[in-house]
Amino acid sequence: MPLLTIGDQFPAYQLTALIGGDLSKVDAKQPGDYFTTITSDEHPGKWRVVFFWPKDFTFVCPTEIAAFSKLNDEFEDRDAQILGVSIDSEFAHFQWRAQHNDLKTLPFPMLSDIKRELSQAAGVLNADGVADRVTFIVDPNNEIQFVSATAGSVGRNVDEVLRVLDALQSDELCACNWRKGDPTLDAGELLKASA
C-alpha cells in the first residue's frame, strides 16, 4: 500500500497501548493496569500527531520520542494529541520505557501495532516489515494535512512538526520558515503589489 498523503483520511484503528505518564506512579494491581485500548474515535475535535518509529530498543528512535515528550505541553496547548506507534508489543514498549531514562515519564501513549494493520493501512511498512520513520498531522476531521518521512538513520525534527501544526491551525498563507506570531501572507496585497 502506498504512503498516505495530504487529503487522505487517516485509517481507523483500535490498538493496545502503554499508557502515558510516570509508570512508577501508576497504582497497578496487575500488569494490565499499564495498558489501555486506543481507538481512532477517542480524540474527537482534536488534532492528532501520529508518528511511527521502526523498532524499540534502537538508537535514533528514543531521541525522537524524547523530543516529542519535551514539547508535549506545546502540542497540548494547540489541542493536539501525540500518538506514537511501532510494530513492537505493548510489553516491549513497557520494558523499553522502564529501562531508558529519557522515556520513563513519557506523557503520551505508545501504541502497539503488532499485527501491522495500521502501519500497512497508512503505507508506512517497509520491505523489512517494520514501520518507516513517518509523521502525520491529522486534522479534527480525520484528514491528513502533513506527512513527513525520513531515512531510518535520520531523526525527524519535532520543532518543525510543531511549526507546521501552528501554520495549519492559522488557516492563513504562511511563508517559508514562518513561526507562530509572524505575519502571514495577504494574497490580495501581494497581487496588488505585483500589478
Curated annotation (Swiss-Prot):
Its EC number is 1.11.1.28. It comes from the Bacteria. Homodimer; disulfide-linked, upon oxidation. 6 homodimers assemble to form a ring-like dodecamer. Identified in a complex with AhpD, DlaT and Lpd. The active site is a conserved redox-active cysteine residue, the peroxidatic cysteine (C(P)), which makes the nucleophilic attack on the peroxide substrate. The peroxide oxidizes the C(P)-SH to cysteine sulfenic acid (C(P)-SOH), which then reacts with another cysteine residue, the resolving cysteine (C(R)), to form a disulfide bridge. The disulfide is subsequently reduced by an appropriate electron donor to complete the catalytic cycle. In this typical 2-Cys peroxiredoxin, C(R) is provided by the other dimeric subunit to form an intersubunit disulfide. Residues 4-170 form the Thioredoxin domain. It catalyses: N(6)-[(R)-dihydrolipoyl]-L-lysyl-[lipoyl-carrier protein] + a hydroperoxide = N(6)-[(R)-lipoyl]-L-lysyl-[lipoyl-carrier protein] + an alcohol + H2O. PANTHER family: ALKYL HYDROPEROXIDE REDUCTASE C, THIOREDOXIN PEROXIDASE. Changing C61 to A/S: No enzyme activity. The gene is ahpC. Induction: Induced in isoniazid (INH)-resistant, KatG-deficient strains as well as in INH-sensitive strains when challenged with the drug. Increased expression in these strains probably compensates for loss of katG activity in detoxification of organic peroxides. A possible member of the dormancy regulon. Induced in response to reduced oxygen tension (hypoxia). It is hoped that this regulon will give insight into the latent, or dormant phase of infection. This is Alkyl hydroperoxide reductase C. Belongs to the peroxiredoxin family. AhpC/Prx1 subfamily. The active site is at C61. Thiol-specific peroxidase that catalyzes the reduction of hydrogen peroxide and organic hydroperoxides to water and alcohols, respectively. Plays a role in cell protection against oxidative stress by detoxifying peroxides. Together with AhpD, DlaT and Lpd, constitutes an NADH-dependent peroxidase active against hydrogen and alkyl peroxides as well as serving as a peroxynitrite reductase, thus protecting the bacterium against reactive nitrogen intermediates and oxidative stress generated by the host immune system. Does not however seem to play a role in detoxification of isoniazid. One of its GO terms (biological process) is cell redox homeostasis. It is found in: Cytoplasm. SUPFAM superfamilies: Thioredoxin-like (SSF52833). GO terms for cellular component: cytosol; peptidoglycan-based cell wall; plasma membrane. Its main location: cytoplasm. Keywords: Antioxidant, Cytoplasm, Disulfide bond, Oxidoreductase, Peroxidase, Redox-active center, Stress response. One of its GO terms (molecular function) is oxidoreductase activity.
